Amino acid sequence: MQPRNNDILTPSQLNTLARDLLEGSFPAIWVEAELGSVARPSSGHLYFTLKDARAQLRAAMFRMKAQYLKFVPREGMRVLVRGKVTLYDARGEYQMVLDHMEEAGEGALRRAFEELKARLEAEGLFDQARKRPMPAHVQRLAVITSPTGAAVRDVLSVLGRRFPLLEVDLLPTLVQGNSAAAQITRLLQAADASGRYDVILLTRGGGSLEDLWAFNDEALARAIAASRTPVVSAVGHETDFSLSDFAADLRAPTPSVAAELLVPDQRELALRLRRNAARMVQLQRHTMQQAMQRADRALLRLNAQSPQARLDLLRRRQLDLGRRLHAAFNQQQERRAARLRHAAAILRGHHPQRQLDAMQRRLAALRGRPQIAMQRLLERDALRLRGLARSLEAVSPLATVARGYSILTRSDDGTLVRQVDQVQPGDALQARVGDGVIDVQVK
């Protein structure tokens, strides 16, 4: 039986079908193997074989991925790789193209870390909404760490320099090894249950993933999330992340930074206190000045509205009117005297005795006439002044008081009491009578 033409494939077509089948059947997969025949040409790509005791397969990692490797791949090294299975069409060889490679020992831990992190994250253990805020002023701190490590020295040094008044309790523990995670968890739970601390700090220095593994324990992560006391995690270096970092309420990149985040610098605090004190003194002085100015203005308004002030104003007006009248009288007298002197000079220039006598008679008449007119003017002005005085006396509150009446005002604000419903039993009043003021109380 002869095949049909459309059933016959070329090698390239067959390789293409095989490649599509491989890539569709194998998504990104993980493989742990030993490296063999490692080659790195000038292009920067990596070519090698992945093998175990019974088989091997070709693999490649292109330069864009290979440049981020944290180690130098060598033949015989055991690695954990991730990539996809494909087929190199030109030679019909199937191979893996990798996007990730790490040493196998740490790689296994890394995979376990990622799986546990994903599971706890799905439960909401790392949600930002459940994290507790840090207290504004930490007074007592529990530090859970190794008593001999560099981390505790860094923390205590920074705390002593920045805020020596802080009370610090060191809770010593192992920070790596099989029993470290359980011991750290027990100390954390005990410190939280005591209720004595404002913050609990978990910390240790840097190390490999295996060295830091105690802080990736599931029970410890759950204890951190359940703690009622805020927890700060400062494990390893800035590039190291542990599950305790994600579960804690605050993650610090290093132990020293954690100490700086927890307490203020005493020098900055003292400077801020001095500035605040100066602002408070200035504000108090300004407030007092404003209050005194308001009191002065109120006193001026009160004085301006009192009966005594009105009476004083009328008296000043009366005195001013008298001075003006007296000045006008003097001016008129001066003008008339000047005319008389002028007339006398003219008379002295004429020799006939008869004219002189006549002029003297006229002069005598003229002298009497202004005096009479002036006397009448003065009498009329005096009468007008007496009338004004009687009018002022009639409207003066003090005149009313002198006739036996009294003026009632409130003691607290000086308000004039005009009606009964303005006062209540127990109110303090002042009664102004003719010769003084009497304090009274409403019953």
UniProtKB/Swiss-Prot annotation:
GO terms for biological process: DNA catabolic process. Heterooligomer composed of large and small subunits. InterPro entries: Exonuc_VII_L (IPR003753), Exonuc_VII_lsu_C (IPR020579), OB-fold_nuc-bd_dom (IPR025824). One of its GO terms (cellular component) is cytoplasm. Keywords: Cytoplasm, Exonuclease, Hydrolase, Nuclease. Its EC number is 3.1.11.6. The lineage of its organism: Bacteria, Pseudomonadati, Pseudomonadota, Gammaproteobacteria, Lysobacterales. It comes from the Bacteria. It comes from Stenotrophomonas maltophilia (strain R551-3). This is Exodeoxyribonuclease 7 large subunit. Bidirectionally degrades single-stranded DNA into large acid-insoluble oligonucleotides, which are then degraded further into small acid-soluble oligonucleotides. The gene is xseA. One of its GO terms (molecular function) is nucleic acid binding. Belongs to the XseA family. It catalyses: Exonucleolytic cleavage in either 5'- to 3'- or 3'- to 5'-direction to yield nucleoside 5'-phosphates. It is found in: Cytoplasm.
